[in-house]
From Swiss-Prot:
Start and end residues of each BTB domain: 32-98
SMART domains referenced in this protein's UniProt entry, alphabetically: BTB
Protein name: Modifier of mdg4
Amino acid composition bias (Acidic residues), ranges on this chain: 567-577
Length: 610
């Protein structure tokens, strides 16, 4: 009897702990396997929770592969209402504003959320002798670089699963698209994978036999709100006819919110009724149809979508982009003390930055149109990832993560060695030395003939304006001389330029008197000329000797004593005469002070001889 005894183990607050665990997993983003897109923003969730809370989602998820992360696009559903519904399904309660309550209830009824709506299907009104829908005609097609899927609106609500192989030799890679409509809202949209180089190639879409019409959905890649348009259903008839919509009636302008889409149908709207039709597409019997330029122009106005491609693996791949993972990790979530008030942060609802114009959806009847797409990841001309749905305005963590990822992707150039180059503020070119020397030689008024004096060491010094200059350097045909004056260890900075014949001032001004004597110079001076004649006496001395010879010839007849006396007087007169009589500019010695000293010394020597 002891073996038959059983113990009852009870977990207190099991339901609360279980729902709290689901909500915590949602807040952290753990094990999420489905994304719900509404108004260009994405809400991540778990298939299990959605299937338990809604027969609509249960039927949808059982028809799609379970090892992939599905993305469901919901038309005619606001992002705020979807967010509140997710909160209600995970927590069991939600706070909704009064003005948003009608949209919330209508969305819950369309999605068949338990606890908010009656899940019993609405009775279908009988149709008047409508022929039963025939089996769909399956047409195999191959997906090229550019794939266009055109479908026309259908009167009855349904959803379709379509699996397409890419035909590139990879057996493991396939593309699955699921189109769901819960009402009879007639719509016409297009799915296209854009590539400019193959814009002319398009694939004929599946065509059903008489009694059925096809539906299509659009996966946009540009961030614009879905345009809502009113559809005009026609009166019902005995048979369902295929309606052809013209370009002018069926084109939806993404920039004009007042555009209405006209479509002609013959079936009555039946909400909450779902008809499943499956079509298998193979890549072996694909047919490519070349369309004329006129047909291409007619279809340019239709909307085109690019399905995302993700790798299919045996096990679910929950790895996300590093930018999204970093953004989810850094997000902060607010939790109250009571579990019923727990809410998750808006970081889970990201906006599609790269999303295009969403398809216009029908608002009548409270219907909802959803699209689920699963694709294979490949390197194409345009790469698509989950980061394209990131809302930079709402989620700061994801934005910072994306910025860090893009910064790491950009390569930093290597740092160069050596001293960094400094920018020169003055970009004007400096004049060259030769140009300066040539400009100095243009001053003819201040120039003088070149006169040199020999030195005791065999060198020469230039005489200019009574000052002596020593040779400094030579540039081309020009020689530069610097003043020889030196006092207290400081040299005079005056320099002159000589072109071998004349001397020109170059730079600087004298701040000293002329030198009284220079022991290094000899009394002989010379000027460079063609004959190279060197004069040992100065012009003043030559004039003095000429005057004395004339006086001696005139007084030869007089006595020697008187002659000597007269010579002495003549010498004095002749010595004073050059000072009184002005001489020509060419005969005047520039160094007058030195000549005076020399004349006095010469007079003293003559007196000693006598």
């Amino acid at each position: 009897m002891a073996d038959d005894e059983q113990f009852s183990l009870c977990w207190n607050n099991f339901n609360t702990n279980l729902s709290a665990g689901f909500h915590e997993s949602l807040c952290r983003g753990d094990l999420v396997d489905v994304s719900l897109a509404a108004e260009g923003q994405i809400v991540k969730a778990h298939r299990l929770v959605l299937s338990v809370c809604s027969p609509f989602f249960r039927k949808m998820f059982t028809q799609m592969p379970s090892n992939t992360h599905a993305i469901v696009f919901l038309n005619n559903v606001s992002h705020s209402a979807l967010k509140d519904l997710i909160q209600f399904m995970y927590c069991g309660e939600v706070n909704v504003k009064q003005d948003a309550l009608p949209a919330f209830i209508s969305t819950a009824e369309s999605l068949q959320i338990k606890g908010l709506t009656d899940n019993d299907p609405a009775p279908q009104p009988p149709q008047e002798s409508s022929p039963p829908p025939a089996a769909p005609h399956v047409q195999q097609q191959q997906i090229p670089a550019q794939r266009v899927q055109r479908q026309q609106p259908r009167a009855s609500a349904r959803y379709k699963i379509e699996t397409v192989d890419d035909g590139l030799g990879d057996e493991k890679q396939s593309t699955t698209q699921i189109v769901i409509q819960t009402t009879a809202a007639p719509q016409a949209t297009i799915v296209q994978q854009q590539q400019p180089q193959q814009a002319a190639q398009q694939i004929q879409s599946q065509q059903l036999q008489t009694g059925t019409t096809t539906t299509a959905t659009l996966v946009s890649t540009n961030k614009r709100s879905a345009q809502r348009s009113s559809l005009t259903p026609a009166s019902s008839s005995a048979g369902v006819k295929r309606s052809k919509t013209s370009t002018s009636a069926n084109v939806m302008d993404p920039l004009d919110s007042t555009t209405e889409t006209g479509a002609t149908t013959t079936a009555q709207l039946v909400p909450q009724q779902i008809t499943v039709q499956t079509s298998v597409v193979s890549a072996a019997e694909a047919k490519l149809h070349q369309q004329s330029p006129q047909q291409v122009r007619q279809e340019e106005a239709e909307y085109i979508d690019l399905p995302m491609e993700l790798p299919t693996k045996s096990e679910p791949d929950y790895s996300e982009d590093h930018g999204d993972a970093a953004g989810d990790a850094e997000g902060t979530y607010v939790e109250d003390d009571t579990y019923g008030d727990m809410r998750y942060d808006d970081s889970y609802f990201t906006e599609n930055e790269d999303a295009g114009n969403q398809t216009a959806a029908n608002t009548s009847g409270g219907g909802v149109t959803a699209t689920t797409s699963k694709a294979v990841v490949k390197q194409q001309s345009q790469n698509y990832s989950e980061s394209s749905f990131v809302d930079t305005s709402g989620d700061q963590g994801n934005t910072e993560a994306q910025a860090a990822t893009s910064a790491s992707a950009t390569k930093i150039p290597p740092r160069k060695r050596g001293r960094p180059k400094t920018k020169v503020e003055d970009q004007t070119p400096k004049p060259k030395l030769l140009e300066k020397l040539q400009a100095a030689t243009l001053n003819e008024e201040a120039s003088e003939p070149a006169v040199y004096a020999s030195t005791t060491k065999g060198g020469v010094k230039l005489i200019f304006n009574g000052h002596l200059f020593k040779f400094s350097f030579r540039k081309a045909d020009y020689s530069v001389f610097q003043c020889c004056y030196r006092e207290h260890g400081e040299e005079c900075k005056v320099r002159v330029v000589c072109d071998q014949k004349r001397v020109f001032p170059y730079e600087g001004e004298h701040v000293h008197f002329m030198q009284a004597s220079d022991k290094s110079c000899l009394p002989s001076q010379f000027m460079p000329g063609e004959s190279g004649v060197i004069s040992s006496l100065s012009p003043s001395k030559e004039l003095l000797m000429k005057n004395t010879t004339k006086l001696e010839e005139a007084d030869d007849k007089e006595d020697e004593d008187f002659e000597e006396f007269e010579i002495q007087e003549i010498d004095e007169i002749e010595l004073d005469e050059p000072e009184k009589t002005p001489a020509k500019e060419e005969e005047v010695d520039p160094n007058d002070f030195r000549e005076k000293i020399k004349r006095r010394l010469q007079k003293a020597l003559q007196n000693k001889k006598k």
